């Protein structure tokens, strides 16, 4: 009797395990089908911060390594502003206009000139307003590529005053205004600049800039590509096989990046901070709540990182791209609590609970609130506060 029971128990256990693996396989397959059965058409529009180091091709490499079919097109010109790309009488603006009116797209990645975002944010908004109509009609989702600040700060003309802003101050303005514009048009923000600052904070020995202290190094462009990849597909780049000297690095675009540093860039771009609503409309005096979520696929991968690094050969680097390979195993996720905190840009207009995200709209107008983590992630949401209508009773 016991022998028969054991026999049936083994059969039942085998059936259960078989069903489990079938279910897991089905879920993985269903997730992959979402990407493998479609070819995504993606257009990049920007200046040198987009085309330096062939960053859009790096993005394509990440897609290829993850078996995501995509066609990537770029329209770029050095120093250009979105207002020029939005002008169809401009040489490159005409190319953008033709690309958006004669084709359908899945995503259009826009990158604004940093000086415009700091000095003339309304000009950037007007340009995006023009481009958004074309993007929407082309069936695409708009993505704002938020770039890094100057490494050593810079002087800007703000409200007729010449002000020197540090890299941190520039990054704050760039991030806030990029989110402000994206929120207005239901766009996504690829916060590469935020991730740059996180690398500079936690891995100061990694070379993230060219010698001009403005444009990204190859490592910096790889971080940007990883950030945009995660933003568009909501798919972590952590563990992606598009790595230096891999079969997917066909053009040797990232051969100058050490394996260790490439994995760090993937790790930094892996974690994201998301808000349940990036644009909320409420009435003055109304109470409401926003919820932010921190996401990361990371676990302690120090052993895997070390094993992979040992397999890496030393690469020859030009003097402009020579970087320091980080030798520590600091995990930027595990060393932070990543507790989410809230704050209002204008506390006199929006009163928000720093812990819960519950807020009260105090004044009519559009205002931003931000959620942050101690690991340096930041996300802005726009609250559109309407003046309540007043009802009048007329007695005859």
Task: List each model region and its residues.
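Bacterial N-terminal signal peptides
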Residues: 12-23
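Conserved beta-strand segments of alpha/beta enzyme cores
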Residues: 69-71, 141, 188, 341
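Conserved SGNH/GDSL esterase-like catalytic core that processes O-acyl groups on lipids
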Residues: 40-43, 49-126
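Sec-dependent signal peptide cleavage junction
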Residues: 22-34
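Extracytoplasmic soluble-region selector
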Residues: 275-396
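Bacterial N-terminal signal peptides that target proteins for export
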Residues: 2-13
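Conserved catalytic region of serine esterases and O-acyltransferases that act on ester linkages
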Residues: 208, 215, 225-281, 303-306, ...
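Alpha-helical cap/lid subdomain in secreted, periplasmic
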Residues: 97-218, 230
